[in-house]
Amino acid sequence: WPAFAPMGEALPLKGYNTEDDKVVNSNPAYTSQPNPNQVVNIAPDSERLQRLAPFAPWDGNDFTHLPLLIKTKGKCTTDHISMAGPWLRYRGHLQNISRNLLLGAINAFTGEAGIVTDSLNSNKCEVWKVAEHYRNECGGSIIVAEDNYGEGSSREHAAMEPRYLGVKVVLAKSFARIHETNLKKQGILALTFVQPSDYEKIKEGDTFDVACADIHVGTPIQIVVHHTDGSTDNITAQHTYNELQIKWFKAGSALAAL
């Protein structure tokens, strides 16, 4: 073997050749604007396809009196949040596929999967029905979870469904990184407990006041938990939003912020 070290330049002296401009300019699709008069026809009775409506922007106020939708226990993957299998035929119809919301999630109070108690009428039913009821009657709801919430495949529907059904906040001990970002993209406030043991303070029938009106990068969020017996608990939560992600939240979603 030669006794001398290989010789050569670590990087090209004149930099790398790039022809991005040529690529962009050669394809009208990169520079043209969509035709606002173009009509996409979807059968009104289609079960598979539904035109998406933009999510509403945040009104700038604290979230108050948010009812607890579900307190999940243990592992809660994206498949627990939005099951695949036969549900995939509805992936182009947000209203229909949202009926699988948290079907596999374990209710921390009962040990049942996908069934919760509606605090407005005491009925026990699927999570999506209660979420829809809270959205219509209370303006939204909150999900409380344990560690690594949203682990598994990075399916967007696991964030789009709760957003569609009015979930405003997900408060967890920790998040799977990609799902946390997906929640941010859909305009849901993703928070973690500063003290993970505060998870134990959450009781069935609780409502939440989330002080997010003054949200800034790196600042904690104060939460007041109201219990059915009239007592309260104060909880400090934290977030990982940067300036761009806060703009997503304010606009209602990342897409709306574009």
Q: What kind of feature is each model-predicted range?
A:
Residues W1-L258:
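Fe-S-dependent hydro-lyases/dehydratases of central metabolism
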